[in-house]
Design a protein with these regions (language model features):
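Bacterial N-terminal signal peptides that target proteins for export
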Residues: 3-19
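Active-site beta-strand->loop->alpha-helix modules in alpha/beta enzyme cores, enriched
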Residues: 13, 34-198, 210-211
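Eukaryote-biased detector of low-complexity, proline/serine/threonine-rich segments
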Residues: 408-460
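Short, solvent-exposed loop/linker segments at the N-terminal edge
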Residues: 367-373
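The feature marks non-catalytic terminal segments
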Residues: 38, 191-359
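Short solvent-exposed strand-capping/beta-turn motif centered on an Asx-Ser/Thr pair
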Residues: 382-387
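Bacterial N-terminal signal peptides
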Residues: 18-29
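Short, solvent-exposed loop/linker segments at beta-strand-coil boundaries, enriched for Pro/Gly
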Residues: 395-402
Length: 461
């Protein structure tokens, strides 16, 4: 039986890395182990430093084939920014409409992203219903606010490339929200490239198709210069699925809209038309963008270390990768690049837990509570690996509890905590104040863009 602390001291690790790992690793209610193939894929993703932001107007506007392709095959950080939450749509599964429908469609998007591997963001724009043109849309929306929120999300996510679902020149030929979303994306790009201190995406693409050209024949005749053709129908042996199958499962989460998508087997082409940025000489949308650890000063040794972990990965004993990942984590801590440091520390923390196969749950014993009511919380932990992990303690609601429990192989730990329900009443942050026809309003400025508010309680394990 080995103890993880051994790897810190025998390798002359600074103790602060161990403390940071133990205290700040988990902020969620449940962590479950993943298969070795899933862990291996995330190891490879740890070695890719590139980001893609897909942008459109509503839930279900996103092209899940493209999102899944970049997330699962290119291994880029991938996200979908939807201008609205789809409040103005139909509902084929219930009676909920308007704000209640927006809540349902928000959850449908989150379910879709869990499948295709992307992240999900929003602006505070309201889907007020069908709009004839972008001029009308941008009059009812607060154009400046939506643009500011889009710029802010780009600054936080830092995409290398942005992909618009719609064409900014399609006024009058499609939903005004659609065209407006592309216009806002291009305005954001232009504004950021006027600010030398801002994060500047390298390119903006339009995810074009024959639909935007009227028919298949017109699309065949189109000038393909500056257009990237990507085959999104490839097979992923680590999941046993084609990209089309993953995308179809993701697309089928839009149940309120009656959407379901059967996977089309074989080659499936998607086209990205360059709208803004440096022209391409190859079929690679990341052309000229360093997506390796060499993009960061001092990052080259980290890439080499991760490559060795990938080469040495034991599918029958993934826990063997945990100690070298701890060493890589210490190397990442030394970097000056705060953005990629934050992104990759989060990824590597998750990977260490998954390599060990740790199962951690911290749950309330009832789904709802009234302020002042007695509340019981239960912590469950299990470590199936032959490495000993020490459960040092837990903090929640301003209280700290020392545990110092050695999680030896498959030894179950469980402990209950009694407290009282307190704090603000849980509510979707965009619905706590009366909005306008075109915009939701909140005083929680730091939450704008998030799919949902933070959990009522957070725990540090």
């Amino acid at each position: 039986m080995k103890d993880l602390n051994y790897f810190y001291y025998s390798k002359s690790f600074n103790f602060k890395y161990a403390i940071f790992f133990v205290l700040l690793l988990l902020w969620v209610t449940s962590i479950k182990a993943q298969t070795s193939s899933e862990v291996y894929k995330k190891l490879k993703k740890l070695n890719f430093l590139g980001s893609v932001l897909y942008l459109a107007a509503h839930p279900d506007d996103e092209n899940t084939r493209v999102i899944s392709y970049f997330s699962n095959h290119v291994l880029a950080r991938t996200a979908y920014l939807s201008m609205t939450r789809g409040d103005g749509g139909q509902n084929l599964i219930g009676a909920e409409l308007r704000e209640a429908l927006g809540l349902i469609r928000t959850q449908e998007l989150l379910s879709a992203r869990k499948i295709d591997g992307g992240s999900q963001f929003f602006t505070m724009a309201n889907d007020f219903g069908y709009s004839k043109n972008p001029t009308e849309t941008l009059t009812i929306w607060d154009k400046d606010q939506v643009l500011e929120q889009t710029i802010d999300r780009i600054q936080k996510f830092k995409p290398d490339i942005i992909i618009n679902r719609f064409n900014s020149g399609s006024s009058g030929r499609t939903h005004g929200h659609h065209t407006a979303s592309a216009m806002i994306s291009e305005w954001a790009y232009e504004a950021l490239h006027k600010n030398e201190k801002a994060w500047q995406p390298k390119r903006v693409f339009h995810n074009t198709s024959r639909y935007f050209y009227g028919n298949r024949e017109n699309f065949k005749k189109a000038n393909r210069e500056g257009m990237v053709a990507i085959n999104v129908g490839g097979f992923d042996p680590l999941t046993g699925k084609t990209n089309s199958e993953i995308a179809a499962l993701s697309r089928s989460q839009h149940k309120s809209q009656g959407f379901g998508s059967a996977a089309a087997l074989g080659e499936r082409m998607e086209y990205l038309e360059l709208v803004k940025g440096k022209k391409l000489s190859t079929n690679n949308p990341f052309e000229g963008i360093d997506t390796k650890w060499t993009r960061i000063k001092g990052g080259s040794p980290i890439g080499k270390a991760i490559n060795k972990i990938i080469d040495d990965f034991d599918f029958s004993a993934p826990y063997k990768s945990a100690p070298p990942l701890l060493e890589v984590k210490a190397m990442i801590f030394q970097l000056n690049d705060t953005h990629w440091k934050k992104v990759k520390i989060k990824e590597i923390n998750s990977l260490i837990v998954q390599c060990l196969g740790l199962k951690l749950q911290f749950n309330a014993q009832m789904p709802y509570g009234v302020v002042g009511e007695d509340l019981q919380l239960k912590l469950i932990a299990n470590n199936p690996s032959p490495l000993t992990v020490v459960l040092k303690g837990i903090e929640f609601k301003g209280e700290a509890y020392d545990l110092n429990f050695s999680l030896k192989t498959n030894r179950l730990f469980n402990k209950s905590f009694d407290t009282k329900t307190s704090g603000a009443i849980s509510s979707p942050y965009w619905l706590t104040q009366k909005g306008t026809q075109g915009m939701y309003i909140t005083d929680k400025k730091e939450w704008i863009g998030r799919a949902k508010p933070p959990a009522a309680y957070k725990a540090k394990i």
